[in-house]
Amino acid sequence: MYNVLTDLQEYYETEIRILQQTKERKEVSTLQKNYAIQRCLGASFYAQRLGADFDKIDKLYTKCKKTIDNI
């Protein structure tokens, strides 16, 4: 069975990994962080439309946002 939350978490991890790799080469700008957060939020809305549980999406998104903010 297709698991939307697993795909969503993998997407978040990819966004975080991209920012971390960017940070290794140069400083990550606030604009880059905000853009990554917006992409994660968009993926969250899409996951909700596919029927994923909102509370679980919110928990994953909050964790992702905090991680991105700390990069």
Regions flagged by a language model, labelled:
Residues 1-30:
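N-terminal acidic leader/helix
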Residues 31-70:
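Short, charge-rich amphipathic interface segments used for partner binding and complex assembly
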